[in-house]
């Protein structure tokens, strides 16, 4: 499949022009929204993206440690380790991180959605949320496969325990409901405890 050059992708990002006392200043739309303490987590959760999200969280904490940060999520999930880097930073920093699902929050995306500040986790009305157990695939010697299988079981148990804490669901319910892909509407995600509310409009 043909990949668009980075220069073409960059050209598709809208620019915002602001008037200041020193004249005009232009920002790409994401940088402008970062000034409003808005971060976008869009697409596959992977190491490079996680590093950018972590850097933005730390920057906004240094700017105003007492103001909320808004993390908008539209993601099919991805790497557990990359996702946990974002999650741990969300819990570590002083500002509350409010999470909002736009489109979809699946797998690690759903975990990060649930990991937002209590009372400040939201879905938009037509978004979808999906939880499941972590995926794993490994080839090699039998003893190495056994080691990796044990590791993924440990990760599964850890994620289930943390999801139980964030949702208020018993661990047995989480284990059952993450055994296979489990899709939820925005209202179902709120009822389950993955988010606190469904937002139709601001205010």
UniProtKB/Swiss-Prot annotation:
Primary location: cytoplasm
One GO CC term, this protein: endopeptidase Clp complex
Listed EC numbers: 3.4.21.92
EC supergroup of this enzyme: hydrolase
Residue positions of the active site: 107 (nucleophile), 132
Subunit structure comment from the entry: Fourteen ClpP subunits assemble into 2 heptameric rings which stack back to back to give a disk-like structure with a central cavity, resembling the structure of eukaryotic proteasomes.
Gene designation per UniProt: clpP
Catalytic activity, reaction form: Hydrolysis of proteins to small peptides in the presence of ATP and magnesium. alpha-casein is the usual test substrate. In the absence of ATP, only oligopeptides shorter than five residues are hydrolyzed (such as succinyl-Leu-Tyr-|-NHMec, and Leu-Tyr-Leu-|-Tyr-Trp, in which cleavage of the -Tyr-|-Leu- and -Tyr-|-Trp bonds also occurs)
GO molecular function: ATP-dependent peptidase activity; ATPase binding; serine-type endopeptidase activity
Keywords, ordered alphabetically: Cytoplasm, Hydrolase, Protease, Serine protease
Protein source organism: Shewanella piezotolerans (strain WP3 / JCM 13877)
Name by which UniProt lists this protein: ATP-dependent Clp protease proteolytic subunit
Cited function: Cleaves peptides in various proteins in a process that requires ATP hydrolysis. Has a chymotrypsin-like activity. Plays a major role in the degradation of misfolded proteins.
GO biological process terms held by the UniProt record: protein quality control for misfolded or incompletely synthesized proteins
Cell location: Cytoplasm
Similarity annotation: Belongs to the peptidase S14 family.
């Amino acid at each position: 499949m043909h990949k668009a050059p980075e220069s073409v992708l960059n050209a598709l990002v809208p620019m915002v022009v602001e008037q200041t006392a020193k004249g005009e200043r232009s920002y790409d739309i994401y940088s402008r929204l970062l000034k409003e303490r808005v971060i976008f987590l869009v697409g596959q959760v992977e190491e490079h993206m996680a590093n950018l999200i972590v850097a933005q969280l730390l920057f906004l904490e240094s700017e105003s440690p007492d103001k909320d940060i808004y993390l908008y999520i539209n993601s099919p999930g991805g790497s557990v380790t990359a996702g946990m880097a974002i999650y741990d930073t969300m819990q570590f920093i002083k500002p509350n991180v409010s999470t909002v699902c736009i489109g979809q929050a699946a797998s690690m995306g759903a975990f990060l959605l649930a990991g937002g500040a209590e009372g400040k986790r939201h879905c938009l009305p037509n978004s979808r949320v999906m939880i499941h157990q972590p995926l794993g695939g490994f080839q090699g010697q039998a003893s190495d496969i056994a080691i990796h299988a044990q590791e993924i079981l440990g990760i599964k148990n850890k994620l289930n325990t943390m999801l139980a804490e964030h949702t208020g669901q018993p661990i047995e319910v989480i284990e059952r409901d993450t055994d296979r892909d489990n899709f939820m509407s925005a209202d179902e995600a709120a009822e389950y405890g993955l988010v606190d509310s469904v937002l139709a409009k601001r205010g």
